[in-house]
Amino acid sequence: MRERLDPVDPAHLRPAFKTVLRHLQRGKALEEMVFVQGHDLLALDGTGYFSSKAIACDSCLEKHHRNGTITYSHQMLGAALIHPDKREVIALMPEPIVKPDGTEKNDCERNAAKRFATKFRQDHPPLKVMVTEESLSSNAPHMETLQAHNMRYLLGVKEGDHAFLFEQVAQAEHAGRVTYYDRDDHNANVHHRFRFVSNLPLN
């Protein structure tokens, strides 16, 4: 199977993903996936699916180690429509993260996200989505890409990666500009406390 699939350009799979989503839209299946204010929740995350120190191709990403060895890998930016109350997800066409033809420089998740956003809007121009991603995606250039493609976003942040932002939150809290929301999850016996604050600089 791998020998058959390896030479196939992933772009040839794009029409299949597009057709599946179109059929789901026509069948009203996406109506159950609406998350908030008419927007579907679109999860994006980079992942690796091949790694080897012995097997490589021209498209492999390369990681050079201090001991002189090289790890070759293939990665992709995975995408799926999700809903917190649903077990089912709707997979969308992933974007490969591979070394471009004729270059020595590795590709990266940020560049893959730019390509994904462009292709997504070409395939699904009217679909309202809210992108959710991990802390590594919480940077101004990526947010500008999402905004340019009419995508809302809900991005995670970590204190270690966004120290300045957390300082701003602490100052806003001290000034009384933070709104709190408490919620009990009785099934898990957990109490949640959320803090909301707007109009803070990211960095």
Which positions does each model-derived feature cover?
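Domain-level cores of phosphate- or acyl-group-handling catalytic modules
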Residues: T103-F164
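A generic alpha-helix structural signal
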Residues: F17, K114-A117, V169-A170
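A short glycine/small-residue-enriched secondary-structure motif
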Residues: M1-R4, T19, E173, R195-V197
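Short, glycine/charged-enriched secondary-structure capping and boundary segments
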Residues: A56-S59, E144-A148, Q168-A170
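Short, conserved catalytic/metal-binding motifs centered on acidic residues
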Residues: M1, G38-Y49, A79, A113, ...
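Active-site-proximal, Lys/Arg-enriched surface segment
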Residues: R4-K86
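An anionic, glycine-rich sequence signature occurring as long contiguous blocks
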Residues: E159-N203
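Electropositive, glycine- and tryptophan-enriched low-complexity nucleic-acid-binding patches
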Residues: H64-L127
